[in-house]
């Protein structure tokens, strides 16, 4: 398991775990370490995270994840 600290993570562990689960699920699909790392770059604010949302068939949750990622990046 890879861990990357986000500035807004303190007190938002639940949000972090929800967002991180997308990267974990994406890694489990492809079994490529670079995907797991890239998905978490810049506190999940990157195009890889979007690709992982689509790959895990969760793109309908994009607005919620956008808010959560913004909170974690703050």
Swiss-Prot record:
Residues passing through the membrane, by range: none
Record keywords: Amidation, Disulfide bond, Hormone, Neuropeptide, Secreted
SS bonds (residue pairs): 6-43, 23-39, 26-52
UniProt subcellular location: Secreted
Residue numbers of Alanine amide PTMs: 74
Biological processes, Gene Ontology terms: circadian rhythm; neuropeptide signaling pathway
CC terms in the record's Gene Ontology section: extracellular region
Domain of life: Eukaryota
Gene3D superfamilies according to UniProt: Crustacean CHH/MIH/GIH neurohormone (1.10.2010.10)
SUPFAM superfamilies: Crustacean CHH/MIH/GIH neurohormone (SSF81778)
Pfam families from the UniProt entry: Crust_neurohorm (PF01147)
Entry coiled-coil feature ranges: none
Alphabetized GO MF terms: neuropeptide hormone activity
InterPro entries the record matches: Crust_neurhormone_CS, Crust_neurohorm, Crust_neurohorm_sf, Hyperglycemic, Hyperglycemic2
Record-stated family: Belongs to the arthropod CHH/MIH/GIH/VIH hormone family.
The protein's role, per its UniProt record: Inhibits Y-organs where molting hormone (ecdysteroid) is secreted. A molting cycle is initiated when MIH secretion diminishes or stops. Has little or no hyperglycemic activity.
Protein name: Probable molt-inhibiting hormone
């Amino acid at each position: 398991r890879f861990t990357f600290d986000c500035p807004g993570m303190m007190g938002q562990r639940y949000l972090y775990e929800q967002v991180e689960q997308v990267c974990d699920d994406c890694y489990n699909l492809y079994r490529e370490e670079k995907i797991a790392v890239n998905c978490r770059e810049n506190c999940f604010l990157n195009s890889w995270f979007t690709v992982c949302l689509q790959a895990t068939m969760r793109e309908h949750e994009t607005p919620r994840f956008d808010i959560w990622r913004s909170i974690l990046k703050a």
